[in-house]
Amino acid sequence: VNVPRAPLTPYHAPPKPVPLTAAFAAVLLAVLTALAPAAAGAQEQVIRGGDVLYSSTGPSCTVGFNAGRGAERYALMQGHCVRDAGLVWYADAARTVEVGRTEGVSFPGDDFAVIHYTNPAFTYPGELSSGLPGGAIEITGAAGPSVGQQVCHAGGTTGLHCGTVVSVNDTVAYPEGTVFGLFRSHACVEPGDGAVPAFSGGTALGLIVSGASCSSGGATFYQPVVPALQAYGLTIS
């Protein structure tokens, strides 16, 4: 009896595994890293006008406005605050995160100082921290004040408060000396407001250097920002 044979299935050896080279592994890791979602809780680190910086010697001072010169970023601040505050500035009260160093101080005579930001992990936009529901206030330029012009500031105590410029070229006497060329408004300040920046619309006008409470009439004096910008070749941006 002839029994038919079943057809034979050809045998193919499995392909040999391709070794994972170091170069290929590095490329694969880079691709997977790029596709991975950002770590939970990661937030952009920002310092705006109206934020507080902490000095190496103890005092803290409020940033007036951020400004630029080329690719470098700077902060305008009160001269009489920075004068006694040391060279190094930190973003935190524990003084562990250095963000800048004092570039120069003009006080008395004027009342402004310039801090050079040195920490690339932060951004320093031309915005003000308002503490209001609308968020940050965008500042796009600077100008000198004029009598009758509206002026506003967002303080930690009074919130957003506005008034009118009532005089320019005013003088204030400090124990350390006299400051000239200030302007004045009736937009009052209260303890806790700090040396907040003053603006009109999207235009930087000045830095508060002294003021009276709202209950006493609210005369507030400001250092104009334009002389400070011109002295260091800076622009608000």
Please provide the spans of the model-predicted regions:
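Short, conserved glycine- and acidic-residue-centered signature motifs
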Residues: A42, P108, P191
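Active-site region of chymotrypsin-like
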Residues: V46-P59, G126-P133, G159-S237
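Noncatalytic regulatory segments and standalone regulatory/sensor domains
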Residues: N2-R5, G41-S55, S60-A67
